[in-house]
Amino acid sequence: NGVSNAEILEINPEFAKEITILDKLRYDILTHEKGGKIRLNLEVTYIFGDTGTGKSRYIWEHFSDEVCVITNYKGNGTFDGLKPTHDVLVFEEFRDSIKLKDMLNYCDIYPISAPSRYADKPIFATKIFIISNWKFEKQYSEEQIIDPESYQAFLRRIHKIMEFKKDGEIITYNSVNEYFKEKNISIVSEFKLEKVSDETFQNLINGK
């Protein structure tokens, strides 16, 4: 019924020796219940701001302990800590840290499993946060040029952008379009504009 390990141990400390079995049972039950289902309620939020502005603290203050934080992007153990009970998935310190095509899958509503060292882990999270010091438009700047179609798909995955300011202000943009309009940013990153001809830039905007 959704009782956590801590709550079980509070009821009866004797179950401490059975925690591993309980975790396995919980994993099997949740995988059976949630596996293959479309996450129609999935919300993907991009959070950015300078170090020390409270980006990570915001997650822990607003959500339960069922949070999986990804910090290691090297090797095949990135998702080792992911559990079926994790409703919130956080990509911390994200700087083009995962290939764009993989990120598109992880942020999609359709059933997907993420690779880990021992067995692939299904992603059941209904809230995904991408946290970075980088402004949103800096992510995947190369792909904006060489694979604009995939980049457009990435833009469609993002439901909300939150900007954390040094003075403590949090500005929320309820869509990528709202953010781009407010910041007067073109679809192609401003970090790459000097390397692209006017004709190429216009074609990319027009989806050609």
Regions found by a protein language model. Name each.
Residues 2-41:
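N-terminal pre-Walker A segment at the start of P-loop NTPase domains
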Residues 32-35, 55, 74-78, 114-118, ...:
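A generic local structural motif
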Residues 38-41, 63, 81-86, 121-124:
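Flexible, charged surface loops at secondary-structure boundaries
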Residues 45-47, 68, 89, 129, ...:
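Hydrophobic/aromatic beta-strand patches that form the interior of the parallel beta-sheet core
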